[in-house]
């Protein structure tokens, strides 16, 4: 469609040129030459301006480089203000205050030398990207903000982040299929398939409490959960949060959740939560009150105004009976998963899991061994496999036979306390 129109235009121009006299064509040529000359002069002037601007930019970058020399003075943003000077304010030309005439954002900051400073000119950082509480690097002399610094966290909190993912798998856990399913539904699915919950209009649980006797696989389950998800994993221990100084434990909890927000999605695993989550009581001892303050900070982080649904909490304890009711209520640790002693079938599966890398004789009957290990937990069954291997090593055997496992059961049974009642 476009080709005939171009042909029509060119034929029209040819007809127009044919009808023009020689003088008209000469005049039109001169006009075009003048236009070309003017355009060339404009292009030359623009190139010169461009070169001068490049030179100025280079000079300014050199000045910025000189001003940005380390070390910086560290400061905190206290407040961000909007400056709107009145348009009708008239001042004498000799006494114009340029700072008062500026429009835009100004900053009040507090430096590490305990000085509070008002900055009408922010510096080299975009003012819209700043917010109160940000850590910034400022020039030692002019106090202009030169760079934003990463958030400050307690070094103990940074050490809680698990850098190397655990190698455990759900296949390493025997006899806890129901518990695995409940944990995956509450923690893993909301992170990997969030849209399924949104379709149903269901809010997933914020936290999970794993409880049961020692040695039943609570920590192992949390490690397997960390290995199966791509989320950041923070591991806290309850006794770690009990600190000597007042407010130190609460600050650790606050910093841990703040770090989790920055690295979201994130799973926070609190082992032995009964160290800080016991029922509240009247006490004259300041240490008890400090533990209660730490627990109150944990409650606030779980469902306070600043709670984040991308952060999931897994807590583990073997004393669920002494935990504070406020910690156990729905909306905080919504789902409670019990880890009982393994059944006979589960014991056989656990023995097979722990002996799968061992050179075991084909005649070993794991079902019979499971019947002989009544009231054994997962950790004790692992100890049985270790003892059986040590006995085979002692007699210079190349395979672990059924008698070695029986002897291992007897040895673990002898070391085990007569009563398995861990609660007073």
UniProtKB/Swiss-Prot annotation:
- List residues traversing the bilayer: none
Q: What is its main location?
A: cytoplasm
- Glycyl lysine isopeptide (Lys-Gly) (interchain with G-Cter in ubiquitin) crosslink, residue number(s): 235, 279, 416
Tell me which residues bind ATP.
212-219
Tell me the segments the record calls region Disordered: 1-21
**Deletion phenotype:** Displays a severe male gametophyte development defects in cv. Wassilewskija but not in cv. Columbia due to the complementation by RPT5B.
UniProt keywords (A-Z) are: Acetylation, ATP-binding, Cytoplasm, Isopeptide bond, Nucleotide-binding, Nucleus, Phosphoprotein, Proteasome, Stress response, Ubl conjugation
Q: Give GO terms: molecular function aspect only.
A: ATP binding; ATP hydrolysis activity
Location in the cell = Cytoplasm; Nucleus
- Write one Pfam family the protein is assigned to: AAA_lid_3
Record PTM N-acetylalanine, positions in chain: 2
Q: Does the keyword RNA-binding apply?
A: no
Q: Which GO terms describe its cellular component?
A: cytoplasm; cytosol; nucleus; proteasome complex
Share what the entry says about its subunit structure, partners included. Answer: Component of the 19S regulatory particle (RP/PA700) base subcomplex of the 26S proteasome. The 26S proteasome is composed of a core protease (CP), known as the 20S proteasome, capped at one or both ends by the 19S regulatory particle (RP/PA700). The RP/PA700 complex is composed of at least 17 different subunits in two subcomplexes, the base and the lid, which form the portions proximal and distal to the 20S proteolytic core, respectively.
The record, for PANTHER family, names: 26S PROTEASOME REGULATORY SUBUNIT (PTHR23073)
What is the role of the protein in this entry?
The 26S proteasome is involved in the ATP-dependent degradation of ubiquitinated proteins. The regulatory (or ATPase) complex confers ATP dependency and substrate specificity to the 26S complex. Interacts with transit peptides of proteins targeted to the chloroplast, and may be involved in the degradation of unimported plastid protein precursors. Plays a essential role in the gametophyte development. Involved in tolerance to zinc deficiency, possibly through alleviation of oxidative stresses or processing of poly-ubiquitinated proteins.
UniProt record similarity statement:
Belongs to the AAA ATPase family.
This protein's name: 26S proteasome regulatory subunit 6A homolog A
- This protein's encoding gene: RPT5A
């Amino acid at each position: 469609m476009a080709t005939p129109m171009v042909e029509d235009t060119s034929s029209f121009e040819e007809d127009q040129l044919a009808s023009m006299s020689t003088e008209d064509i000469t005049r039109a040529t001169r006009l075009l030459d003048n236009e070309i000359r003017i355009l060339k002069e404009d292009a030359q002037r623009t190139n010169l301006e461009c070169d001068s601007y490049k030179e100025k930019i280079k000079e300014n970058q050199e000045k910025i480089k000189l001003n940005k020399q380390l070390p910086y003075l560290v400061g905190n943003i206290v407040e961000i203000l909007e400056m709107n000077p009145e348009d009708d304010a008239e001042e004498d030309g000799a006494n114009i205050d340029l700072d008062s005439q500026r429009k835009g954002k100004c900053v009040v900051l507090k430096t590490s030398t305990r000085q509070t400073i008002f900055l009408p000119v922010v510096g080299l950082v975009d003012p819209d990207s700043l917010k109160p509480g940000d850590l910034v690097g400022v020039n030692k002399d002019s106090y202009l903000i030169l760079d934003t610094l990463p958030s400050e966290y307690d070094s103990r909190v940074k050490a809680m982040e698990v850098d190397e993912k655990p190698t455990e798998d759900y296949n390493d856990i025997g006899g806890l299929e129901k518990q695995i399913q409940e944990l995956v539904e509450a923690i893993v699915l909301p992170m990997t398939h969030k849209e399924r919950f949104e379709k149903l209009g269901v809010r997933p649980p914020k936290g999970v409490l794993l409880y049961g006797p020692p040695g039943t696989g609570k920590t192992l389950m949390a490690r397997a959960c960390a290995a199966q998800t791509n989320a950041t994993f923070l591991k806290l221990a309850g006794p770690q949060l009990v600190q000597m100084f007042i407010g130190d434990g609460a600050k650790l909890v606050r910093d841990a959740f703040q770090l989790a927000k920055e690295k979201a999605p994130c799973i926070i695993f609190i082992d032995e939560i009964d160290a800080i989550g016991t029922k509240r009581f009247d006490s004259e001892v300041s240490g008890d009150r400090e533990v209660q303050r730490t627990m109150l900070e944990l409650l606030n982080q779980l469902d306070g105004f600043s709670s984040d649904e991308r952060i999931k909490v897994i807590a583990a304890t073997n004393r669920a009976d002494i935990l504070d009711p406020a910690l156990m209520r729905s909306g905080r640790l919504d789902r409670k998963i019990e880890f009982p002693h393994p059944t006979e079938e589960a014991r056989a599966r656990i023995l097979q899991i722990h002996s799968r890398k061992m050179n075991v004789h084909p005649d070993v009957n794991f079902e019979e061994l499971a019947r002989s290990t009544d009231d054994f937990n997962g950790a004790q069954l692992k100890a049985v496999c270790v003892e059986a291997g040590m006995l085979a090593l002692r007699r210079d055997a190349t395979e672990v036979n059924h008698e070695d496992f029986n002897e291992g059961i007897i040895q673990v049974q002898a070391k085990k306390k007569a009563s398995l009642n861990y609660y007073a």
